[in-house]
A protein has these predicted regions:
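A glycine/threonine-rich phosphate-anchoring loop and its flanking beta-alpha core
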Residues: 107-203
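A short, small-residue-rich loop immediately preceding and capping a beta-strand
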Residues: 83-105, 109-120
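ATP/NTP phosphate-donor binding region
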Residues: 1-89
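Solvent-exposed alpha-helices and their adjacent loops that cap or buttress functional pockets
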Residues: 5-7, 30, 82-85, 106, ...
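Internal helix-turn-beta structural module
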Residues: 307-317
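Active-site segments that bind and position negatively charged phosphate/pyrophosphate groups
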Residues: 195-305
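Short glycine/serine/threonine-rich phosphate/pyrophosphate-binding segments
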Residues: 44-47, 97-103, 122-125, 244, ...
């Protein structure tokens, strides 16, 4: 008798100070003894020695080791089928581009994917989809949830603050996304998975209630990353991005089309979340408090974005 739905979750989840030094140990524990590694632009100089030493000390064979700066689907398909047959895993170290590219390459080759984000700009490092260029258009394509997520909070801390603010914006967006999903079900436009709702709610509530003095506090960064990772699990349970992506994301996608220089995804989403929380009359005080207290609004004010641009896109979205 079928008793429930099978879901995937990461076998490795390590978030903390200094985890990059232990990447070899983590892979060895899963018997992932031969890997290919893709890194974002400039990251070999920054983290290459640390990663290679950890892998060598653990007896991990590195079959390929290169920087990667493409999300063109044709390039990634070629890349995927150039991966040596001896590879037991694909490791991506860096931001959204290299994470998405490595994730999709691993999916095509049915290999475990190890996600090692160097910033906390969104929940993409934990999601089972990849944002790629298909015929020149950004498209979300199916991939596979990461087998492992390894996040060094010291690395996250030293990244530019804009990436932390982007992660904050993406995290609070779960508030309006969940409202939209439940609203849709109530009006016959969808079906809510209650367990996915619970996980997504726990993720965002844990984050917004975290005490901190600075957004670079160890506890704050760990809660941000943990909550973003949980968001990816909520999507896996739901079988869609509904628990974490609603009207606020649609507004951001429309902005991407019209702005000459779009801002980071999480920045646009965070502003759109505040607007939609007011429209929904749902937890807008909490959203405003988080975005004010963290300095998100102050940072966004330096970017020259106009309120009307967001308001104009509500109808388009």
């Amino acid at each position: 008798m079928q008793t429930g739905k099978a879901i995937s979750i990461p076998s490795i989840l390590k978030v903390g100070n200094g985890t990059l030094n232990k990447i070899g140990e983590y892979l060895k524990s899963e018997e992932l003894t031969s890997v290919v590694i893709f890194m974002g632009n400039g990251l070999i100089d920054m983290f290459g020695d640390t990663i290679m030493k950890s892998l060598t000390d653990a007896g991990i064979t590195v079959l390929e080791y290169s920087e990667l700066d493409t999300v063109e689907i044709d390039d990634i398909i070629t890349l995927a089928f150039d991966i040596p047959n001896k590879a037991k895993a694909v490791v991506s170290v860096g931001g959204g581009k290299v994470i998405d590219a490595g994730k999709y390459a691993a999916f095509l080759r049915n290999l475990p994917f190890i996600s090692v984000p160097t910033s906390s700009s969104s929940d993409g490092f934990s999601s089972a989809s990849a944002s790629l260029l298909v015929h020149g258009k950004r498209t979300s394509v199916p991939a596979k949830l990461a087998h492992g997520i390894i996040v060094d909070t010291q690395v996250i801390r030293t990244a530019p603050e804009k990436f932390i603010y982007s992660g904050i914006g993406d995290m609070v967006s779960k508030i309006t996304a969940l409202y939209d999903w439940i609203f849709e079900e109530a009006h016959g436009a969808g079906v809510v998975n209650d367990f996915a709702v619970m996980v997504a709610k726990k993720a965002v509530n844990s984050f917004v209630r975290t005490p901190y003095e600075s957004i670079k506090d160890e506890l704050f960064l760990k809660e941000l990353v943990d909550s973003l990772a949980m968001s990816g699990i909520a999507n896996e349970i739901a079988g869609s991005s509904a628990p974490t992506s609603g009207s606020e994301h649609l507004i951001s996608h429309e902005l991407d089309k019209i702005l000459e220089h779009p801002q980071l995804h999480g920045i646009q989403v965070g502003i759109a979340t505040y607007i939609m929380s007011v429209v929904q009359n749902h937890r807008y005080v909490r959203v405003c408090t988080v975005l004010k207290r963290t300095g998100f609004f102050d940072y966004a004010a330096t970017l020259g974005m106009r309120n009307q641009e967001f308001l104009d896109q509500i109808d388009m979205a």
